[in-house]
């Protein structure tokens, strides 16, 4: 059995070398694409974590605002009671002043 001519062996070697180079380039491209995807996924994870932290901060701010609104409602109620008391005192002082004027006449 003849193994072939040196010329055909050289062409076969070049063909194999070309296929191997093509496969290596394809694998390199795939590795680069995979690396980009992993980095993108890592960045997405970071962004998701940051969004979660921001949401917690916003929730705390909302809870603090609700607490402040409750306190302001209580203060408003107390101020209304004080206003009513002052108004009654003004009316009574006006009546007392009228009575005093009537007595002094």
UniProtKB/Swiss-Prot annotation:
It comes from the Eukaryota. GO terms for cellular component: BORC complex; lysosomal membrane. Keywords: Lysosome, Membrane. Disulfide bonds: none annotated. InterPro entries: BORCS7. As part of the BORC complex may play a role in lysosomes movement and localization at the cell periphery. Associated with the cytosolic face of lysosomes, the BORC complex may recruit ARL8B and couple lysosomes to microtubule plus-end-directed kinesin motor. Component of the BLOC-one-related complex (BORC) which is composed of BLOC1S1, BLOC1S2, BORCS5, BORCS6, BORCS7, BORCS8, KXD1 and SNAPIN. This is BLOC-1-related complex subunit 7. It comes from Bos taurus.
């Amino acid at each position: 059995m003849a193994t072939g001519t040196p010329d055909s062996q050289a062409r076969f070697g070049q063909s194999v070398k070309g296929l191997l180079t093509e496969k290596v380039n394809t694998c390199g491209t795939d590795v680069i694409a995979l690396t980009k995807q992993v980095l993108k996924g890592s960045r997405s994870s970071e962004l998701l974590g940051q969004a979660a932290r921001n949401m917690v901060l916003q929730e705390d701010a909302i809870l603090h605002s609700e607490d402040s609104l409750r306190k302001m409602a209580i203060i408003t109620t107390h101020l209304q009671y004080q206003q009513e008391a002052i108004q009654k005192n003004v009316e009574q002082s006006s009546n007392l002043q009228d009575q005093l004027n009537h007595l002094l006449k």
